[in-house]
Amino acid sequence: MKVVAFERKEQGTGASRRLRNAGKTTGIVYGGEAAPQMIELDHNALWHALKKEAFHSSILDLEVAGQSQQVLLRDVQYHPFKQLVLHVDFQRVDAKKKLHTKVPLHFLNAEVSPAVKLSSAIVSHVATEIEVECLPAALPEFLEVDLSKIEAGQSIHAKDIALPKGVALTAHVDAENPVIASATIPAGAVSDAAEGETPAA
């Protein structure tokens, strides 16, 4: 995904306000061996790009002054109540160095699972993203979590995710192995089931 930005020479609150009034958003590019670079971007184009999941989790081709560099979106600052992006941070990516970043989780097949079909359980998504480490070329846009076999009362953990080749959970996620999805039967459904049972004669 390509992003076009422009070099920013003015700094400070006043300069940022003038840029916002002109339909621009301030940003910074940092990391790698190069010095941090102040940039400005078209606000409307950035606003629409931020609505795309891939913009948050993929390697981006950032073009500044005709030169392209690979980056990851690292931070976005929004206005408290206006539909306004105040500032963005991008981190340069080294093709030879592993990066740590969060990848979205896409949950599939819950509707055909035993938990839902046999027990009328509710499958809850406890996490929507997971932190992984890999080389930039191996970074997945998202990870799929197959829920087709989950049963009522069961949970799916981070280590249950099928990871692509070259991708691993970060050390702390691997150690904690957090729950990412669970299947529970609503309290009302349990009560109804109990009331429906008749004692044996």
From Swiss-Prot:
HAMAP family: Ribosomal_bL25, Ribosomal_bL25_CTC. The lineage of its organism: Bacteria, Pseudomonadati, Pseudomonadota, Betaproteobacteria, Burkholderiales. NCBIfam families: bL25_bact_ctc, PRK05618.1-2, PRK05618.1-5, PRK05943.1. This is Large ribosomal subunit protein bL25. The keyword Nucleotide-binding does not apply. Part of the 50S ribosomal subunit; part of the 5S rRNA/L5/L18/L25 subcomplex. Contacts the 5S rRNA. Binds to the 5S rRNA independently of L5 and L18. One of its GO terms (biological process) is translation. Gene3D superfamilies: Ribosomal protein L25, beta domain, Ribosomal Protein L25, Chain P. Keywords: Ribonucleoprotein, Ribosomal protein, RNA-binding, rRNA-binding.
